[in-house]
Amino acid sequence: FAQNGVMLYVPKGVIVEEPLHSVLWGPGANIAHVSHILVLVDEGASVTYVHESASPDDPQGGANSMHAGIVEIQVLQNASMKFVELQSWGRHVWNFSHERARVERSGNLDWIFGAIGSRLTKNFTELDLAGEGAVGRMSGFYFTDGNQHLDHDTQQNHLAPHTTSDLLFKGALKGKSRSVWQGMIY
């Protein structure tokens, strides 16, 4: 179940020229946000999709909120997707997400993460290169300060021959903030 979500289907052979954009805006304190993003890019299709999750900081201080999110992406044969995911939750939000993508034969996924918000973020991300010639890139940037903690766990699985993946995360930390990245390429 989810309170908020997006379902995006790009039909076979359709090339979406302009980026698509969605925003999950989560104002308020002491509440939980549950979201689910489901994307299917059919054979030979192409799309750029930008998703933002954001909220203001708690003006009174002392409150806590939570976000639990799921992202599922399927890029079929000869399809291409650029997925830009931006997170700027308020400093009172505890953010947890599990995200998974599967790229089929000669498909291409460019997955870009940007994180500047939340009290704590724990993100699990898996990329399955399931078809021969599949290509996947995961890149991210983050800027933290105060007592923020960002934790990214990435996994790239080469399940078929002649697949290619690339990974690059960079960030800057200020104050007592912390960041953890761990990952594996199989």
Give each language-model segment a name.
Residues 1-186:
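Conserved beta-strand/loop scaffold segments within soluble protein domains that form the structured core
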